Amino acid sequence: MPIQAVEPRRLYRQIADQIRTLITEGEYTPGERLPPERDLAKQLGVSRPSLREALIALEMETLLDVRVGSGIYVTQPDESRRTAELAGASGPFEVIRARRLIEGECAALAAKSATGAQVRAIREAHTAVLEESKRDHNPLDADRLFHMRIAEAGGNSALVLVVQTLWDQRMGPLYRTLELKLEYPLMAADTNREHKAIVAAIARHDARGARRAMHHHVDMTMKRYSKDWKVEQ
């Protein structure tokens, strides 16, 4: 048999495999509740964000049911459920960490080089996010446009493609399933304030301030996605 390349496996998939094995071997049975997230992360020796990515993947496989305010329960799996779409998917927290690295620099570049028309386009995208938020909608498309406008204003087409790829992952199945566990209206006001600070820094051509504002926004996004999933009552 010819030698085949060894593919690195994402941590959340390794965690998911271990939990899946515990379920298939009968350690946890359908209807049973898993230990609280904090305890389970400690037992596995992993971070809670990585564990959460694994739990979301297993929920999409119908092996688990994450009930906000109640707990994480083993379910009777649906064998017909397709999981191929998860094979190459990045975990939501991987995407957030990558966004911090890339979009912080995009914001700094935008502050240095954005034209008046580009600043107006960023403001218009920010307004669209606000309008969608007022209707209690998760303004995902408007949010994507806001961040793409910033990347475009930086004038680096390679970075624009990277941000586009990150947002393709941002809108993928793992991320979208995670968002169902969150209460978007409670996050909207903070998100909009953070966006406003980014816009202001870019408009005054403050590269350092724009980078700092974007880093703060992405850091707070990580915090919200880590904190607001309450399943341990």
Cite the ranges covered by each PLM segment.
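Hydrophobic/basic alpha-helical segments enriched in Actinobacteria
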Residues: E27, R33, T83-A87, G116-R120, ...
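C-terminal effector-binding regulatory domain of bacterial HTH transcription factors
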Residues: M1-P2, A207-Q233
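Acidic/histidine-rich alpha-helical segments that form the ligand environment
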Residues: V95, A201, D206
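A short secondary-structure junction motif
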Residues: L22, G26, R81, Q169-T177, ...
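Residue-level preference for long, well-ordered alpha-helices that form the structural scaffold
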Residues: P8, Y184-M187
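Short linear motifs at protein or domain termini
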Residues: M1-I102, A108, K112, V231-Q233
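Short helix-capping and inter-helix turn/linker motifs at the boundaries of alpha-helical repeat units
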Residues: R97, A188-D190
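Conserved amphipathic alpha-helical segments that form helical-bundle/coiled-coil interaction surfaces
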Residues: R99-R176, E194-A200, G209-T221
